[in-house]
């Protein structure tokens, strides 16, 4: 993973100190996830991954980002996709839809962008964001892997 850039904001470090550590609940693996970076590395191990972020959609701030390219500003993507998540949640509420939002897919000519809100009660207000190279990724497999990563995170 030497080609990746990882960024964790100082304000996030303070925020994380106030919250329990992320934990992996999958059997036969380390129980403790050292921090958000491990989850991001798992996301970036998905074939075709261009960038990953864990985002607080209350503030629009990326808690952590990991990127394989300098052309994708993940902080801008986090803020913009926060509006997408808020709009979808608001619309579901207005329509009286009482279902769980699993993910939101944005398809571009060369990329897929997958947004997956954390469904655990303790993780509410956060979402995973993954940008994929459309020519190198398998969307179904990427969504499946992202679901597994989301389920393994205990915030």
Describe each PLM feature range.
Residues 2-155:
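Non-catalytic interaction/Regulatory regions outside core domains
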């Amino acid at each position: 993973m030497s080609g990746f850039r990882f960024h964790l904001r100082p304000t996030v470090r303070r925020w994380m100190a106030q919250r329990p550590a992320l934990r992996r609940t999958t059997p036969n693996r380390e129980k403790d996830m050292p921090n958000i970076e491990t989850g991001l590395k798992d996301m970036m191990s998905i074939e075709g991954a261009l960038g990953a972020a864990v985002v607080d959609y209350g503030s629009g701030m990326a808690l952590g980002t990991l990127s394989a390219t300098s052309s994708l500003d993940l902080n801008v993507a986090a803020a913009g996709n926060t509006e997408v998540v808020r709009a979808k949640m608001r619309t579901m509420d207005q329509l009286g839809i009482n279902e769980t939002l699993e993910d939101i897919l944005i398809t571009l000519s060369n990329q897929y962008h997958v947004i997956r809100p954390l469904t655990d009660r303790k993780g509410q207000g956060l979402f995973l964001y993954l940008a994929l190279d459309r020519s190198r990724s398998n969307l179904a497999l990427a969504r499946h892997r992202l679901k597994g990563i989301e389920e393994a995170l205990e915030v």
